[in-house]
């Protein structure tokens, strides 16, 4: 139960939509109510089965010469408060037309003509269609917009909760990742998908599996953000596993997790701070993944500093090239790929790296030298 609680708070910090699966009466709604209370967030509960599609797309209202899609009161309340949790309960009891109307809310946080504030989090709960009253399979486009988490409390969990109280979320508040951490995680996931391109998008054939987590470019990006947020909060492997599988499904999630574990790479931000002092891996695949992450972090830092701190941007530029120079001594092909990427983000007025002679062949490939 603690693993799921931690995964839930990390997904909230990552601003990712969450879908909680569990049997009827297992306490999903009670847990989300406790979560909102412990995190001091306003909570709006919306049960899809008792709403019409217009409750999510907005009710058309004629205003002079235009039509305004008026949002419902629950959306207006969230907008007024500026933050909160929108809890879409009993999702699999909502008919397909209502599920389709929810798509824009989950992905864009837009209800009619109203855009919900960035600090509104979206959580849904669903019973498996086989046990839901008048249940429907979750539509694949809607399912592919969530991190899927399984709520399966054991008898011991329930007994302990009754006797000693259920776990609180007050001690599990998570922080959001910074841009460099997200860039590094996306690079690692992208490098994995280069090795396993068959897993970029795998749409299940059966409706029941299509209503669960499965790989797509969207869910791989969600997986990368979840991994970055886990790193930012020092989460354990069990939490990362839960989130990865919740994003892309068991098969792809376990394979990606195994690949990431085998990489065992140093922190790319640490390497940028000390380009000559951190040992680099020898294996080509690990070296490629690490150098790609270093360049991704460098590009992120350049974008953040170039406009207002040219000295810091130039220093990041110089250090990134020093790392590439180290790699070029043993694996020039890997260095060439990184050089081509870094060269596209040269800060205005930044000098060429001091390692020019050593890097000359690489720089020519990157178009920095004739």
Regions found by a protein language model. Name each.
Residues 1-86, 91-370:
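C-terminal regulatory/interaction module of P-loop NTP-utilizing enzymes
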